[in-house]
Structure formats: structure tokens, C-alpha cells
Amino acid sequence: MGAILPLQWLYEQLNITMSEDVKHLFESIMGSSWGYLALGILAPVAEELVFRGAILRSLMAYFNYRLPWIPIVVSALLFGAVHGNMAQFANAFVMGLLLGWLYCRTHSIVLGVALHWVNNTVAYTMYKLMPEMNDGQLIDLFHGDNKLMY
């Protein structure tokens, strides 16, 4: 949440939005009975196995573990790019930096999977509990009241 809200504000200022195709994809996944399984459980495990367990670990070995920030940034950029749209890129990139740093500190994906799960679960829960936020506008978090927002 600490990165999501400021980035969402920046997206609104720059008028960066998700494409309609991506919005429809999310709505169909979130609306299905297996949506949480896919986004809340399977995605964190699969993405951590690929991006930290395989890509970051390989890059770390290539750089002989001497320059950890280069592999962390490269894997985070790939993680952001794989999310497929500018509206998710920055959030995924920042999350990828954090998860990469955690992997470098622990040499395990377990903590990364847990943090990734929490992140996706919070997003899923907000989507389900606050349908007015489904358009991604911060004003909806404050029930349309500009005074509460600023």
C-alpha cells in the first residue's frame, strides 16, 4: 500500500490507465470463483519461482554476487514488463525491487512468496470490498469526497 497509493496518484496526474482489454480480463478473473486462487495464491508462487528463484538467482551467479543491485534491477524491470501494461509496470517494478532485495538477503523465495501473497490479497480484497474502486481512481477510496482526499 505504501507504494501503490503514491503511484496511483502519479498515474492519475499523468493520465495513465489500463487498457480496456486488461480491465475486462481483470474483471473476469476477479468475478470468477477461482479468481483468488489464480491471483492470490498461484501467481505469487509462480512469479517468485520464475523471477527470484530462476532469473534473479541466475543473474546473481553471472555477476558473481558482487553487484547485487544490477541483477535486482534487471529482474524487477522484467517483472514489471511481464505485467503487460504501463498501469501495472511501476507497481510491479517497485515490488520486484523489494522482492529481489529480500531474495538477496535470505537466498530464499519463501519470504517473497509471503509478501507477494499479502500484496495480491490486499488488492483482491479491496477490489471485492470496495467495488467503487474498480476504476482505480483514488477519489473512490475516499467515497468521492475531495476534502477527505486532500
Enumerate the language-model features and the residues they cover.
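Hydrophobic alpha-helical transmembrane segments
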Residues: 33, 37, 69-74, 89-90, ...
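Hydrophobic residues within alpha-helical transmembrane segments
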Residues: 42, 74-78, 90, 94, ...
